[in-house]
Amino acid sequence: MEQMSVTQFAGELKMPAAALLEQLKRAGVDKSSAADLLTEQDKSRLLEYLRRAHGGGEPKGKITLTRKQTTEIRATDSTGRARTVQVEVRKKRTFVKRDELLGDAASAESPLLEEELSVAGEAAGEAVAAPEPVLEAAPVEVVAEPEPVQPEPLPEPEPEPVVVEEAPVQQAAEPEPVEAAAVAAEAESPESAQPAAPRARPVSITELLSEEEIAAREREARRHRELVERQQADLRARQQREAAAKAAAEARRLDEEAKARAEQQKKEEAAKPAAKPAPGPTGTLHRPAKADDKAGKDAKRGPAREADGAKRRGIKTRGEVGGAASGNAWRGAKGGGRHGRQQDDRQTFQAPTEPIVREVHVPETITVADLAHKMSVKATEVIKTLMKMGSMVTINQVLDQETAMIVVEELGHKALAAKLDDPDAFLEETDAHKDAELLPRAPVVTVMGHVDHGKTSLLDYIRRAKVAAGEAGGITQHIGAYHVETPRGVITFLDTPGHEAFTAMRARGAKATDIVILVCAADDGVMPQTREAIHHAKAAGVPVVVAITKIDKPEANAERVKQELVSESVIPEEYGGDTMFVPVSAKTGTGVDELLEAVLLQAEVLELTAAVDAPAKGLIVEARLDKGRGPVASLLVQSGTLRKGDVLLVGATFGRIRAMLDENGKPVDEAGPSIPVEILGLSDVPAAGDEAIVLGDEKKAREIALFRQGKFRDVKLAKQQAAKLESMFEQMAEGEVKSLPLIIKADVQGSQEALAQSLAKLSNDEVRVNVIHGAVGAISESDVNLAQASGAVIIGFNTRADAGARKLAESFGVDIRYYNIIYDAVDEVKSALSGMLAPEKREEVIGMVEIRQVFTISKVGSVAGCYVLEGLVKRGSSVRLIRNHTVVWTGELESLKRFKDDVKEVKFGYECGLQLKNYNDIQVGDQLEVFEIKEVARTL
């Protein structure tokens, strides 16, 4: 190794050069200036000097620890009173550092010196890192040897036996703190504390030792680490054994206490009848002592035989025998008397037990009995709590989740919202779509816009079909799904209704779609349903392509449409936005190709993909009940391939697909992603908008469908019950509201849903539309029976009643109304509700009369002679008495005369005499305002 100067060596040790020169001089190395060079011999001499100066050869240390710990326990004395006993535990341990832990003298001194010289320098830190565990291992090593480390507990002699048990427990419970204290004391001993002084002058060990010595020290350090790890493992094992023994002892103690309490309770129950005064002996009066002697002999023979004897002979005793007979056989006859009763009283003391707080998992619906079982209380407690909350319930009544959680909190337990064991989780586990290969698919395009803006006509031109002419009233009332093969690729179109009643249908269309074509007529501009369509598209996060239709009309103004759409945040590309605007004409076909081009361009940007070789997933677009084929559903396949014969689960319905038809009514065997089909074979008409999934197991599909049906029914019943309880007082305060009960039957699910929602919107505070039943299909006899029982009107939307239902309706007098256009149904129900409204009362002034003279007639009262200033006066009219421009009285005319004759009316310019009903305070100059109250029919 090359030589270095004193300055360089001092810089490496991070100490002043002057201090290093002073140490070198003491070590016998003659260096006069900081520029002098140091050799290896100089460094070795400095190291030997430092070893001698800091006690490298001192005798090995020894440490003695004395530990005192004071605790308190509560124990009962012979009188049964509890008192506090002071328990003091003294422990003394001696720790000796053994020779075999440090090895030979050279390997023991060099690690100590290394640590002394290397703490201050970063350069020397790496060389010392390996031998450092030698210092840490030394005190812990001693703990592993049981002979010298054995503690010497010196407990104070205590009279109580409990203290003798307590001392060893406290010894065993705290080995670690004593050993930790030993390690800390060892670290603070003079042997380890003295080297702290020369830390200001560290020396690099790598410069003083050879590679063989460093390797030997590393082997020694590794040996010590392994030894320490073995000792620590043994210590942990011993602690675990002690903890297990302590836990077993505690369990035995608790078990014995529980048995003692149980026996004490039995003894108390047996002693209760003994409190009554015992009857006299059964023998005769002149031989009472003999019976007592027999009882004493039985007591001497033992409690068990005493009990047997009592049972055989039926001897009446003072309760000890009863106690033995009831299971407390350990208690003999000697336990009687005052001292025995004191012992009983002492043993009956029980510590107060804390209430058990349980975590109760509350599902969406739960019965009162099940809720009580989960809390381990009686059902009557739950019913009492609900009664305090104002709810009268029975033990089998279903509670909703919110109410049940409130009850659980009231009873002091912790409520957790939980779901039932939902078999729907099976669907997530068997999801095969994650591993399937994703391939490009056709875009699903929804055509949306205001009514009569030309959506269906535009699709007609694209499909070269005539659908709009077949729609009732020329407006679309169903959602239609078609796929069109264009030269540029396949596009699936969804045609949604534009009428305001079909909001839910449009929302479903936006949910299932990839691109929205927003149709806006050039001659009409932005209308309410246009704005709603924009909101649906934004809510679904779907890109929009605007088609401005009817540009062939002379009054068309495409620029006005653009300006109005800009105010709705739909900005065209030429204005700097990202929305494509295409002017089209459904009659001439102008711009249709450009529209399809824009749609396919948008689809390429979206990079639409779906799994093809996987079980199908899709969305129910529309559903209806066909008389010959049963439930028929329009399904849009979103991923996977749907095949004939697959088991399909749709909401709460399921079934095996018996047939599949395309939009033209032609049978198909399979349908891939983005292809709409009609399917037959479901168990019931599904709700439009439900998700459909193909399962491999029909049994699992039936289980999930039945579970969903029951869950829906339970939630519905619970909500109805909650609504009844909440609205009870409101209904009592408001009085009975007039309602119009209706039964709605429609051809498809979406139309029935839209009609029910539109009619429900007509309700107000006075009249209400109550849709008792709504379903899909023809009007049946059961519908007529339901209408007859509830007094409802049946509305058939695009459907008819069968022959049996018509005949039954005629005999019952049930009103059945048929509609093809939703406008007509809404208008007629609106007029019916208007007729149910209470008429509005209005006042109409018909004349003004001035009082010119007042006559007072006995037995009649005051009669006014009047002059008609305006209009006319009728007999029985309502009048207001006005004095000094202030209304004084309002009432009716009692009589009206002209001269002496009673008349029906007196016209303007004539005089008359009149009398007011139950009012005589009239004066000359007063005016009477004559008015009538007319009833005016109200409208919604």
UniProtKB/Swiss-Prot annotation:
GO terms for molecular function: GTP binding; GTPase activity; guanosine tetraphosphate binding; translation initiation factor activity. Residues 549-552 are annotated as: G4. Residues 449-456 are annotated as: G1. Keywords: Cytoplasm, GTP-binding, Initiation factor, Nucleotide-binding, Protein biosynthesis. The keyword Protein biosynthesis applies. The keyword Nucleus does not apply. Residues 474-478 are annotated as: G2. GO terms for cellular component: cytosol. Residues 214-271, 289-311 have a biased composition (Basic and acidic residues). InterPro entries: DNA-bd_dom_put_sf (IPR009061), EF-G-like_DII (IPR053905), EFTu-like_2 (IPR004161), IF2_assoc_dom_bac (IPR013575), IF2_II (IPR044145), IF2_N (IPR006847), P-loop_NTPase (IPR027417), Small_GTP-bd (IPR005225). Residues 138-354 are annotated as: Disordered. Residues 585-587 are annotated as: G5. Residues 440-609 form the tr-type G domain. Residues 138-147, 161-208 have a biased composition (Low complexity). Its main location: cytoplasm. CDD domains: IF2_eIF5B, IF2_mtIF2_II, mtIF2_IVc. GTP binds at residues 449-456, 495-499, 549-552. It is found in: Cytoplasm. Residues 495-498 are annotated as: G3. Pfam families: EF-G_D2 (PF22042), GTP_EFTU (PF00009), GTP_EFTU_D2 (PF03144), IF-2 (PF11987), IF2_assoc (PF08364), IF2_N (PF04760). PANTHER family: TR-TYPE G DOMAIN-CONTAINING PROTEIN, TRANSLATION INITIATION FACTOR IF-2-RELATED. Belongs to the TRAFAC class translation factor GTPase superfamily. Classic translation factor GTPase family. IF-2 subfamily. One of the essential components for the initiation of protein synthesis. Protects formylmethionyl-tRNA from spontaneous hydrolysis and promotes its binding to the 30S ribosomal subunits. Also involved in the hydrolysis of GTP during the formation of the 70S ribosomal complex. This is Translation initiation factor IF-2. The lineage of its organism: Bacteria, Pseudomonadati, Pseudomonadota, Betaproteobacteria, Rhodocyclales.
